[in-house]
Amino acid sequence: MFKTYTAAPASVEREWYVIDADGKTLGRLATEVARRLRGKHKPEFTPNIDTGDYVIVINADKIGVTGRKEQDKIYYHHTGYVGSMKSANFSQMQQRNPGRVLEIAVKGMLPKGPLGRAQLKKLKIYAGSEHEHSAQQPTALEI
C-alpha cells in the first residue's frame, strides 16, 4: 500500500535564488517568485507546510508591464482616517518604492494567513543590482 509523503518542517532544505528583474514583465516574474516561495517546484511540496525557498530579486526598479498599464494600473490604500483613500499608478509606485509593486503582486499570489506571511518574509527585493546576501551563495535563476 502506498503512503502519501508529508514534509516535516524540520526536514525542509531551503535554497537561495537570485533573480534579475531587468526587463521582466511584472506578472510573469511574480508567478515564478510565488511558486518558489511556496515550494511548488519541489516534489516534497506540502500545502500546509512552508517548503519554499528564499528568493532575492535585484533590479526591481526595472520591472516592466505591457500595454498602457504603466499609467492605467492604479494601486489603492487607505490610511484609516475618514476620506483618506490614496491612489498611485504603476509609474508613481515605481518612483516612490520600486520593490513595492512586485511585493503586492506576489503577496496576492500567496495563501492568506500565517503561512502566507511566513512565506512572504523569505522574499528579498532590491532596487539596484547589489544585494547583501552573498554569504548564502544564491543560485542565479533565469526566467
From Swiss-Prot:
Belongs to the universal ribosomal protein uL13 family. One of its GO terms (molecular function) is mRNA binding. InterPro entries: Ribosomal_uL13, Ribosomal_uL13_bac-type, Ribosomal_uL13_CS, Ribosomal_uL13_sf. GO terms for cellular component: cytosolic large ribosomal subunit. Part of the 50S ribosomal subunit. NCBIfam families: rplM_bact (TIGR01066). CDD domains: Ribosomal_L13. Keywords: Ribonucleoprotein, Ribosomal protein. One of its GO terms (biological process) is translation. This protein is one of the early assembly proteins of the 50S ribosomal subunit, although it is not seen to bind rRNA by itself. It is important during the early stages of 50S assembly. This is Large ribosomal subunit protein uL13. It holds the Pfam family Ribosomal_L13. PROSITE patterns: RIBOSOMAL_L13 (PS00783). It comes from the Bacteria.
